Amino acid sequence: MMDTKVLCGANSYEQKYYFNQEFSSLPQSIKDELHIMCVLYTEDVGGILTLEFDDSGALEFKVTAPEEDYLFDEIGSVLKIKQYQEEKREMLESLELYYRTFFLGEDLDGEE
């Protein structure tokens, strides 16, 4: 069963940003960073970007764009996501830890 929970997302077609209020307890600086990251991605590349947690707590970048959108930069998309994963590694790992602790109820003290 692959249930995902959307953290946030941005849509270049409607020029909108979405933040899941279930995560409202995150620090404002993290929420701001996510907002900037998603909006800049869609401004640079186009399409729709969502950051989603999978059922194991891994944070994934999901990108969608209609096939008829010839302005969507598929190569730029891969490069931009790779850039974010490197530059924002610490923040992304912290978000995964937060999700696994508060949403999945994992006891992280017992990790080996």
Regions found by a protein language model. Name each.
Residues 97-100, 104-107:
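Charged/polar positions within long, soluble alpha-helices
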Residues 1-4, 105-112:
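Short acidic DE-rich linear segments
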Residues 1-44:
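Negatively charged, low-complexity tracts enriched in Asp/Glu with abundant Ser/Thr
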Residues 26-30, 81, 92, 108:
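Short, structured coil/loop segments at alpha-helix boundaries
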Residues 43-99:
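Amphipathic protein-protein interaction modules
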